[in-house]
C-alpha cells in the first residue's frame, strides 16, 4: 500500500507571536486547503466587493516554479497561496515521515527539546484550514512519536468552521491521556 502524500504550502521555523505559546520557538506546517475565501482583508471599501484588488488572482505566475517564488500578497487572505486552486500545483506533497523529518531538521539539535536549555519547541499546524486534513495531522504526529521525538506543545490554528472528526477527537484524547495533560 502506498503511503498517503500530504499537500502543504510551507514548513518553517520562527517564534510564535500570539496565543498561549507566544515567545516559544515554533516549527510550522502550513497545510494546503481551506473552506473559506477571505478576499476582504486589507481592502479599501469592504462594502464594495467589485472594487477589491485580489493580488493572488492577478499575480503573474509565468516565472513561479515553487511556493517560495510567489510574491507577498498585500490584499485578500494573507495565506491565499495555501488554498487557492491556482497554486495547488506548487504545493509539495510528501509522506508524513518525510514531513516529520523536515520539521525536525529546522529545530536546534533536530529535536523538540533543545539539547542545551531543555526548552520545549512548539509545533503549529496552520493553513488554509488544517482541520480539512485531520488524518494528515494524526499521521505527522504519529511519525514524530515513532521517531522518539513527539512535541509536548501543539497548536492547530483553525478558522473554527470545521468540527473535529470522531477519529481525530479520539486520537487527541488518547494523546492527552498518555501524556497526563488535560484538555
Give the positions of each predicted feature:
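N-terminal cysteine/histidine-rich coordination modules
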Residues: 1-23, 27-34, 39-54
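Histidine/lysine/aspartate-rich catalytic loop segments that bind and position anionic ligands
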Residues: 177-183
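Conserved Radical SAM active-site core
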Residues: 6, 36, 40-177
Amino acid at each position: 500500500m502506498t503511503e498517503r502524500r500530504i499537500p502543504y504550502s510551507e514548513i518553517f521555523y520562527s517564534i510564535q507571536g500570539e496565543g498561549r505559546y507566544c515567545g516559544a520557538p515554533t516549527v510550522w506546517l502550513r497545510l494546503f486547503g481551506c473552506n473559506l475565501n477571505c478576499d476582504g482583508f486589507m481592502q479599501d471599501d469592504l462594502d464594495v466587493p467589485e472594487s477589491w484588488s485580489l493580488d493572488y488572482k492577478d499575480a503573474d505566475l509565468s516565472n513561479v516554479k515553487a511556493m517560495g517564488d510567489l510574491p507577498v500578497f498585500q490584499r485578500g487572505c494573507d495565506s491565499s497561496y495555501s488554498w487557492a486552486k491556482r497554486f495547488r500545483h506548487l504545493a509539495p506533497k510528501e509522506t508524513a515521515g518525510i514531513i516529520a523529518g523536515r520539521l525536525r531538521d529546522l529545530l536546534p539539535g533536530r529535536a523538540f527539546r533543545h539539547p542545551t536549555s531543555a526548552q520545549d519547541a512548539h509545533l503549529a499546524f496552520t493553513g488554509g484550514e488544517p482541520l480539512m486534513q485531520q488524518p494528515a495531522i494524526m499521521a505527522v504526529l504519529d511519525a514524530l512519536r515513532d521517531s522518539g521525538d513527539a512535541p509536548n506543545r501543539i497548536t492547530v490554528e483553525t478558522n473554527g468552521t470545521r468540527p473535529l472528526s470522531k477519529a481525530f477527537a479520539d486520537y487527541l484524547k488518547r494523546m492527552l491521556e498518555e501524556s497526563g495533560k488535560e484538555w
